[in-house]
């Protein structure tokens, strides 16, 4: 009995370690596949209205995206493989929230701020969709 308990704890630790070590790009890729697979199920209730950001820079609309996901999750029959989709989306949200915590500010020299600003503007100029 004691050996069974030790094996159960060891198995749980291994599963937890594996889950923690999955790279986020793998989770995102898997979630995109699941979303495509379950699209018909997710769109079966056309009376549900979800917030869809009008802005094309998705990184600015994260809050709206996850509010819509919460509504969709509450309107969808639970269980089966669609549950994995929502678990992955939850992992992605937690990852984004952890990354946002890194936005905390720190007092630095003007040169360091300008370096950061230049990098930010470079990303904005190449990765953001600019509206006219």
Swiss-Prot record:
BP GO terms, sorted: immune response
Intracellular or extracellular location(s): Secreted
One Gene Ontology term of the molecular function aspect? cytokine activity
The residues the entry assigns to the signal sequence are 1-19
The record's Gene Ontology cellular component field reads:
extracellular space
Predominant subcellular localization, coarse grouping: secreted
Query: Looking at the record's lineage, which domain of life comes first?
Result: Eukaryota
Keyword annotations for this protein, in alphabetical order, are: Cytokine, Disulfide bond, Glycoprotein, Growth factor, Secreted, Signal
Carbohydrate-modified residues are 45, 74, 88
The UniProt family comment states: Belongs to the IL-5 family.
Q: How does it assemble?
A: Homodimer; disulfide-linked. Interacts with IL5RA. Interacts with CSF2RB.
The protein's matches in PANTHER family, at most eight in alphabetical order, are given as:
INTERLEUKIN-5 (PTHR48491:SF1)
Summarizing the function annotation, the protein's role is: Homodimeric cytokine expressed predominantly by T-lymphocytes and NK cells that plays an important role in the survival, differentiation, and chemotaxis of eosinophils. Also acts on activated and resting B-cells to induce immunoglobulin production, growth, and differentiation. Mechanistically, exerts its biological effects through a receptor composed of IL5RA subunit and the cytokine receptor common subunit beta/CSF2RB.
- Name-wise, this protein is Interleukin-5
What gene name is listed for this protein? Answer: IL5
């Amino acid at each position: 009995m004691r050996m069974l308990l030790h094996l159960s704890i060891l198995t749980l630790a291994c599963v937890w370690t594996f889950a923690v070590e999955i790279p986020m790009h793998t989770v995102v890729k898997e979630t995109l596949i699941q979303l495509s697979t379950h699209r018909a199920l997710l769109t079966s209730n056309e009376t549900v209205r979800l917030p869809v950001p009008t802005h094309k820079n998705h990184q600015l609309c994260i809050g709206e995206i996850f509010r819509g996901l919460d509504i969709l999750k509450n309107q969808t029959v639970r269980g089966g493989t669609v549950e994995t989709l929502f678990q992955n989306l939850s992992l992605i949200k937690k990852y984004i929230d952890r990354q946002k915590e890194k936005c905390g500010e720190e007092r630095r020299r003007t040169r360091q701020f300008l370096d950061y600003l230049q990098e930010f503007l470079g990303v904005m100029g190449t990765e953001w969709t600019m509206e006219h």
